[in-house]
Amino acid sequence: MMIPPAEMDGAGRGLRVNREPNQQDAALYQRCFSQFQSGVAAEARAWFFEHFDATTYANMQSRYPPGSRERHLLAEFLGFYESNGVLVSRGLLHEDVFFDAPFALDLVWGRVGPIIEEWQEATGEPGIWENVAWLGKRYKVWYETHWRPKVEAIPPEEGPI
């Protein structure tokens, strides 16, 4: 089954997937969630929420230098959002499914958004964590324009869509 592409703006950027979430989204979500909960990804997530406290790129560089265990955990953690940003931005995973999931993107983006922007500027590499940045910015738009409390979005008396 071919998944319809996201609607595009004038610059060819995806705006919104032009379809309802489906079983493929559910299966992909389950794989993402499983990855998020296991192995190094789980260790990296725990480290991030318990220990990551950099507030600027320079601070991150000094506290978690390249080659350190902490930098590895940060890369593992951000890698989850980077790979899912690819899927969501290309319409391969419906944004409603990803953004409604318990991945704490709002908390993550609040902590790493400014650092990623500084990182891109400092290195002259706008592609560094670009999908994390896209996902964080898109989440904000999605939350402001599409999110509703679950009981309003899918009333219990009506059941699933």
Give names to the regions the model predicted.
Residues M2-I161:
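Acidic, Ser/Pro/Thr-rich low-complexity regulatory regions
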